[in-house]
Amino acid sequence: MKRRSLLSMIPAASALLALRSNGAPITKPTLNDAGFAVSVQCWSFKEFTLFQAIEMAAAAGASGVEVYKGQKLGGDHGDVTFGPEIADDKLQAIIEHLKKNNIVALNFGVVDVPKDEAKARQIFEIAKKLNLYGITTESLGSLDILEKLAKEYNIKVCFHNHPKPTSLWNPENTLKSLEGRHENIGFCADIGHLASSALDPLTVVKKIAPRIHSFHLKDRASLTEWTHDQPFGTGVIDIPGILDEARKAGFAGNVSIEYEHNWKTNLPEVAQCVGYLKAYSKLRA
């Protein structure tokens, strides 16, 4: 396995939240110089509380987080977990903790969105209260209600791929279902899961780039089978090429680092990934 150097491949919470309306384009200082946001999927820190995950994302140098349903808040809130049913006072505590750490909540997922409009609307309401950019889901069967609410709330819907044999394992198949749909409907391209499904991530991204709203970005040792996550630039996935292709198609969304390895001690590795993306951003500015 060859380590790749970025340089060899080349010819930035309410104060922050107030900079954009819910679902509107992400703006500076959350956007980096290359025009996208760098966040950490809180699932990377699933062994910790949400408050700790926010602190760890900040320590790693990220500008945002992607929250998921079921993580304990921690602190004075004990075993209370995050989700669409969370009480307003708990939600306000999260917002204040984000602000304290100069972190923006950008996406919520991966979350199931039901066809029932009232229940689906509850998810969009929590996204609105958190001023989120997008909702990450695999509920393709709820596409009609997702499209309706994505337009109403001006929030991106990002269809995520888990590995084969899950239903959305191949984004090229999902793309057919998105033809003619509103521009807020698109993808959260999980790069590591593409590799686990023996799909070349760069090839897939080239085909779906105009619909990509967010990433779950990973580096791996193989493009044909499951291998564990590792710091960006130490594996075989062409991360600069993937980001270049997305940016060519106008990508200005959320790049969420999802690091599913060394669960209790992965902060230094997540920080390496953030640093890699910062270097990419500077070189592409």
PLM regions and their residue ranges:
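Short secondary-structure boundary/hinge segments and terminal tails
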Residues: 24, 75-76, 116, 145, ...
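Active-site acidic/histidine proton-transfer and metal-coordination neighborhood
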Residues: 10-16, 91, 97-186, 195-198, ...
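Active-site mouth loops of central-metabolism enzymes
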Residues: 38-48, 107-116
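Active-site-proximal beta-strand/loop segments in catalytic clefts of secreted hydrolases
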Residues: 41-43, 68, 109-111, 138-141, ...
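Glycine-/proline-rich flexible loop or hinge segments
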Residues: 76-80, 103-109, 258
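Glycine-rich, proline-tolerant flexible connector loops at the mouths of alpha/beta enzymes
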Residues: 67-92
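Histidine-acidic metal/acid-base catalytic patches
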Residues: 2-42, 48-64, 171-189, 195-285
